[in-house]
């Protein structure tokens, strides 16, 4: 089997630390045939991936991990683009981020005002207008300037204590966005039971297949062997491609969570892409 790790994060994801070239260097050393950068709601590292593929002789499949929702809970879809994602996907990702950030900020400001904190919507809008899509977020920058959140840890603790949750775009819309950008859509880590994200059974996957889902991430560090076998059976029954990857973000002691530690059959994926 020619191995592919089709779920890797670079520093284009806010919670990841690897430079694109670091990923390729490790992938080459570990004998991978192909890899994908699946950064959260970002395709910023794909250009580097396409350039590095020739240097390291490792095939690169441009990708993204889109934050979405299903059944009232967060869910994720992986987009894969044989010819690179079209600019329309960038617009979709930006709109998705902008919408969620504003919804959360409005709810958070209302919460803070209810706690007697002097912060206004007008102040937030001025901060957002200056740098809406940058990191850290406009809400963090505003609360930091006003001395409400001294650092990111304080801000995150404030977020958690508020209990506010805002759902991203519905999963079928994310699937459509992948198709509109010339790619395929794969359900990410369907069995990753964190108590927060949605855990998928065959009925839900079948519903998404009807909505255009192309595949299932069968192989993932969070899946047990039994789950891998069950999701493989579901994928085969529904005619969906089976993908997999390490979901690597930062250096980890668990080998299955590092580059190439979890993988799928590159030729099977390639065959599906070339249909």
PLM region descriptions:
Residues 1-14, 20-30, 44-85, 145-146, ...:
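Charged catalytic cores and adjacent phosphate/nucleic-acid-binding surfaces used
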Residues 7-9, 33-35, 93-94, 123-125, ...:
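A short, structure-level motif marking secondary-structure boundaries and short turns
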Residues 11-12, 37-38, 96-97, 127-128, ...:
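A generic structural signal for short
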Residues 17, 102-110, 115-199:
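Divalent metal-binding pocket/active-site signature
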Residues 17-18, 37:
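An N-terminal domain-cap segment
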Residues 22, 33, 40-103, 107, ...:
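Mid-domain alpha/beta scaffold segments of enzyme catalytic cores
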Residues 36-37, 245:
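Short beta-strand segments at enzyme active-site cores
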């Amino acid at each position: 089997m020619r191995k592919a790790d089709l779920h890797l994060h670079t520093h284009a994801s806010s919670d990841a630390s690897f430079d694109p070239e670091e990923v390729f260097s490790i992938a080459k050393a570990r004998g991978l045939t192909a890899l994908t950068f699946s950064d959260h709601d970002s395709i910023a590292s794909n250009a580097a991936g396409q350039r590095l593929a020739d240097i390291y002789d490792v095939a690169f499949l441009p990708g993204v991990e889109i934050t979405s929702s299903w059944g009232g809970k967060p869910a994720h879809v992986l987009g894969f683009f044989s010819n690179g994602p079209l600019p329309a996907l960038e617009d979709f990702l930006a709109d998705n981020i902008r919408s969620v950030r504003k919804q959360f900020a409005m709810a958070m400001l209302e919460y803070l005002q209810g706690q007697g904190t002097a912060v206004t919507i007008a102040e937030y809008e001025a901060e957002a207008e200056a740098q809406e899509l940058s990191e850290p977020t406009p809400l963090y920058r505003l609360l930091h300037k006003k001395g409400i959140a001294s650092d990111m840890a304080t801000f995150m603790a404030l977020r958690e204590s508020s209990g506010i949750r805002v759902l991203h775009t519905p999963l079928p819309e994310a699937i459509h966005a992948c198709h509109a950008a010339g790619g395929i859509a794969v359900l990410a880590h369907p069995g990753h039971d964190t108590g927060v994200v949605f855990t998928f059974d065959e009925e839900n996957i079948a519903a998404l297949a009807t909505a255009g889902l192309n595949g299932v991430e069968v192989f993932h560090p969070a899946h047990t062997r039994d789950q891998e076998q069950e999701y493989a059976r579901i994928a085969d029954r529904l005619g969906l491609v089976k993908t997999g990857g390490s979901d690597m973000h930062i250096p980890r002691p668990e080998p299955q969570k590092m580059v190439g530690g979890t993988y799928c059959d590159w030729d099977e994926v390639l065959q599906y892409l070339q249909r």
